[in-house]
Amino acid sequence: MRYSVHMQRVFAVTEALYSFLSGKFNVSDLKFPRDIERLILYGLEVPVVRKPNLSLHEAVQYLCVLRGESPKWRADIPNRELYGLLHVGPPCNIIFVREDLPDHIRNYVLAHELGHFLADVFLIQQLWLKTLPEQKETIERVFSWQEYDAHLEFYGLIKGLPHRPKAIVGRGDALAPETAEREIQADLIARELLAPWDTVTSLFRPHESREFIALLREQFGLPLKRLV
């Protein structure tokens, strides 16, 4: 599994993150279980909003108020309860998380939403920065939705750079295949952030699967089953 296409992308994502964070703090100093909320807030400066009864409706209402608009809701979009949600778009990128979850579950949900952000936003932003380094400040403002720059969009089009993504809002029975693929990817990234492959495999002992599962929960904070 380590050499699968999925895992190679996961390793590329996490390595890019650790390289970026190296200018802020030493990733090797992050103790297990890792505090994902701290990493999001101080490493990537992405806001985290906790809601005790998080739902799609609650998130939309919050974003309306943040944009200075009257709260509104589209009747054709069914409301549903959420553990977490990544919003990509104006007024800024935000991660929502349900506040009344157990600490280790909330930490995992945040890691999952961070996985979406890293794969769908962060890597694309890093590619733009690498391709157009002279536009660094503009790219950072554009990717944080502080402004729209038509010239930058044109340069990106000429260079063949990918567009900024939109947020996922559809899950459940109507889940699109590409969205399901993104969910699997975010789940794998979350697990790699919380329990790095190389660290975990060095601790595994044959014929001790029960003890190993308990170790993943106690030392790394992994939930016993997939939640998101």
Positions of PLM-derived features:
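Active-site hotspot residues in diverse enzymes, especially metal/ion-binding acidic/histidine motifs
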Residues: 1-228
